Amino acid sequence: MESDNMKKALIAMSGGVDSSVAAYLMKEHGYDCIGVTMKLFQNEDAGVSRKKSCCSLDDVEDARNVCYRMGIRYYVFNFSERFKEDVMDRFVDAYEHGATPNPCIDCNRYLKFDKMFQRMRELEYDYIVTGHYARVEYDEEKNRYLLKKAVDDTKDQSYVLYMLTQEQLAHISPVSYTH
């Protein structure tokens, strides 16, 4: 039974080991967890055939299975229209103008963090937990949250989270912060 003061964590599930471990750790620490994955493509076959794809149907199924085994509710957020507008259209435009675009950075900025945080607030959850290796600490002297490298330098992914606002940093828990 969930208590009214139980902290709630929305787990950004990629279907991989790191986000699965993050979900497990948060559940073990007594959080009310839900797992979520972003649907990014209108075409159901898009991204499925590649071994290292992002948010493919295989990834969704893997994340769903992990959540089922842990007894965590699971949802897929359909961000396919936003993905086309905020990531793919920007990618094509930049490429046509001779730039070297990075669609993963735009996806992180506009979808994974912006839209996911919006959903977190709508669902009245306290944190977004990711499988990224980084740390977030509050510095009382500076009166702000600091994004720091992971404890293990070889796995550091703090660069992925560089664009987070102070409000977002206050509500994110990367995997290396969950231990």
Where are these regions (language model features)?
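Conserved small/polar residues in nucleotide/adenosyl-binding loops
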Residues: 178-179
